[in-house]
């Protein structure tokens, strides 16, 4: 009697489905604040001295709002910043942009606060403390702006990842890090 041996071949198939739901980047001047909730603003105000920095982080580095990933600092050693405008990345003066970024977000906090201060009276003291600290002490404001600079540098990979995914979605050929990751030598030439 002969024994029949069956050889079975296993075939593994891997499917990778990458879904990118990336919107077109907003121009820096058209940054969208509409996704922010009352809770987001309250968390910012609760950070007292750092509330503008906290708002900037929520607006420009929120993974749920990649279209606002439109500003970052590529190199901490110089005075330049990258800003997305008119479908391109532009090199700008860092100090001027930090001042504008701070002022824009400070204004957004003040407008929100004016609208909701009666609803959240317990935050009146915190917000007034913030305004007084910033108004009365230039050193506090300088420290907050230094923290904003560090945040824009430390979170640059979020912006780079968004840009890379956006380029993949539109079929553009990319290799490695497509955002201008400029070296110190490049910045010295600018």
Predicted segment positions?
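Extended amphipathic coiled-coil helices
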Residues: 1-190
């Amino acid at each position: 009697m002969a024994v029949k041996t069956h050889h079975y071949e296993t075939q593994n198939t891997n499917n990778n489905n990458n879904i990118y739901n990336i919107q077109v980047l907003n121009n820096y001047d058209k940054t969208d604040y509409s996704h922010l909730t009352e809770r987001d603003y309250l968390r910012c105000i609760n950070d007292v001295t750092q509330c503008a920095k906290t708002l900037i982080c929520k607006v420009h580095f929120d993974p749920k709002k990649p279209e606002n990933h439109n500003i970052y600092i590529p190199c901490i050693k110089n005075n330049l910043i990258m800003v997305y405008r008119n479908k391109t990345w532009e090199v700008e003066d860092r100090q001027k942009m930090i001042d504008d970024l701070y002022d824009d977000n400070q204004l957004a906090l003040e407008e929100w606060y004016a609208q909701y201060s009666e609803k959240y009276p317990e935050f009146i003291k915190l917000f007034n403390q913030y305004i007084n600290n910033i108004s009365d002490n230039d050193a506090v404001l300088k420290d907050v702006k230094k923290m904003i600079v560090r945040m824009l540098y430390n979170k640059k990979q979020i912006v780079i990842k968004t840009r890379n995914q956006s380029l993949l979605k539109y079929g553009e050929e990319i290799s490695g890090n497509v955002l201008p990751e400029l070296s110190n030598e490049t910045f010295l030439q600018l």
